[in-house]
Amino acid sequence: MNRILRLRERLFGLASWDASRISDEWFRAHFEYAADVVNHWVGGVLDIPSSRFLNFGCGDGITDLSLVLRYGATSIHGVDVRQEYRKLPRIAREQLGMQRIPVALTFQTIKSGDALARAGRQYDGIMSWSTFEHVRRDQLATILADLHACLRPGGYLFIQIEPLFFSPYGSHLRRYDDTPWHHLLASEEDLWRVIESHEGALDPAEVDFGFADFGVDGYKRFVFNEYKALNRLTADELVEFAKNAGFSVAREERRFLDMPVPDSLAGQYPKEWLLNNEIFLLLRKNAV
């Protein structure tokens, strides 16, 4: 079947699409902003149309779709522990009027800690968008070493994390609780009460395509459990884990928020942790 689809696409080209149809803000953010950032960081060191990519933590695959449609990517394999990517054909129809997904995209469900290098595939580039804060801390070293093994010599891994745990909204719960550093100031029980009692509409850019699967109350519980499972990784720790896995840092950018730090936190945590909201990290596997 895949061979037939490839032949069809070769003969007739990609299915038509129209970005002016986009109505969902989550889709827009990942189709436009996230893809633009990946292209900015990865496109400067790799030729996107001729490179083979792995997306570690691909989610719903929207960013991958954009990289194909807007930046000419021809081979992206997305992996994730969830199966949100199965919704991509429907999402693409609704948001772009697109009748079929490009054959450049393939997806796979994995389990946490699966050794991807065993498949024997070598990639020119790997990307990971807001995923590594969700990786179990005791698996970080193993997973980064595995991703290193998945890259060809001279290949690149791009990692983005936002928000980092100790930053003002590092709980990933801002859609329900806009109090800066509340996760560091309140007990887990008090924090859950705030989430549980929340009423009203959410920021559309924070409502992903999995929301309907859970319902209002179920989604609250889902994101709160995700919060409890965060690995509390700092930017310095991420860089150290990556270096220990064999990567060299090709480029790095850390973004900070300009906010007054509560006195009660200033003595507990380094100021850099508390204000460092985001990291962009481009890593290289040295050539043989």
What label would you give each PLM region?
Residues 50-59, 158-201:
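Conserved class I S-adenosyl-L-methionine
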Residues 62-115:
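Class I SAM-dependent methyltransferase SAM/SAH-binding core
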Residues 116-126:
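A short acidic, Gly/Pro-enriched loop at the edge of an enzyme's catalytic core
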Residues 141-153:
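A short glycine-rich, Lys/Arg-flanked "PGG" loop and its adjoining helix->strand segment in the class I
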Residues 229-246:
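Short alpha-helix
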Residues 245-247, 266-288:
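Core SAM-dependent methyltransferase catalytic element
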